[in-house]
Structure formats: structure tokens, C-alpha cells
Amino acid sequence: MPGPSAPPPPAIYSALALLLLLTPPANAFSCSPLRLHDSAFAWDSLQLLRNMAPSPTQPCPQQHAPCSFPDTLLDTNDTQQAAHTALHLLQHLFDTLSSPSTPAHWLHTARHDLLNQLQHHIHHLERCFPADAARLHRRGPRNLHLSINKYFGCIQHFLQNHTYSPCAWDHVRLEAHACFQRIHRLTRTMR
């Protein structure tokens, strides 16, 4: 004698099972909202940087900071690492360019616009990481953070050693320009 057959699952159970199958895992990395939104970010930022920080009125002596960016950080196909690197660069750029010691000839409105844009993109990148990954992001990847911290620390020492002169800030402007180009390269990796 055949046993009793199980009743078919209600439609709600089928819908929930389908939803679970189609939903990405909680630890999956998803930065898809940034892809179209950020395609012109670096170039818009470069324009704001040009508007904000015109060249100094007097020529600057040839001075180079001994700061070298760890370009190996850009050679990645890992979208999450690219996003972490871009986020860390943006945070340091924001901290540096929001300094109260920026030169008087820099245009306040353009600087404010650039800082707003940086903050906006920092916020969007932070949202790419799951809430439980925020703690992990603050700790690592350790070498990535140390390399970028060292690079921006070198820039800060350069500014201090040159008493925050307009010429030293002009060098920082050039470094920021290079950072926006690096961010553009990283956002291409995130696509």
C-alpha cells in the first residue's frame, strides 16, 4: 500500500525558495550602481582641480617630493581590491585637500565643489561593502593601506618641510592630478 503523499508546498514557499536562489550571497561584492555613475568621475574631478588650483603666480623652483606611489596596487583584476584602493585614495585626497592651510589663491567655491564630489563618491564606495565588511575594510588589506598611508604621509611631510608654501601646494596639486588618473584606472577595473 503506497504511503500518503506530501501535499505540494504552498506558493509562498516556492516564491521564497526562488528568491533565495536568485539573491546574491551577503558577502558578494556589488558595486554595480557605481559603474555608470562614476565613469566620468575622475575626469570631472580633474576639471574641478584645475578650476580650484591655478598655477602659482610666481614660478616655482624645481622641487620634487620623494614620494612614489606603489603602482603595483593598480595592477589588479580583483574588483573588491580596486574598490578598496580607490576608496582609500579618495579618503586621503579628501583629508589632504580639505586642509585649512591650502593656498589663498586657490578658489574656494571650486575647492568646495571638489570636496563635495569627493565626499559623495567616498559615501557611494563605502556603501559597496556589506555592513559586516566595514570592520574588515578598516583593518586591511594591510599592505595596501600601509603603502597608501606611506605615500600620503610623504606628501604631508613635503608640505610641512616647505612650510605649506604655494609652490609645495602646487606639487600636491600635481600629485592629486595623478591620483585622479589612478582612480580612473581602478574604476575601469570595477566595471
Curated annotation (Swiss-Prot):
Transmembrane segments: none annotated. InterPro entries: 4_helix_cytokine-like_core (IPR009079), Interferon_alpha/beta/delta (IPR000471). Induction: By viral infection. One of its GO terms (biological process) is immune response. GO terms for molecular function: cytokine activity; cytokine receptor binding. SMART domains: IFabd. The keyword Disulfide bond applies. Disulfide bonds join C31-C128, C60-C154, C67-C167. It comes from the Eukaryota. Keywords: Antiviral defense, Cytokine, Disulfide bond, Glycoprotein, Secreted, Signal. One of its GO terms (cellular component) is extracellular space. It holds the Pfam family Interferon. Has antiviral activities. PANTHER family: INTERFERON BETA, TYPE I INTERFERON. Belongs to the alpha/beta interferon family. This is Interferon. The gene is IFN.
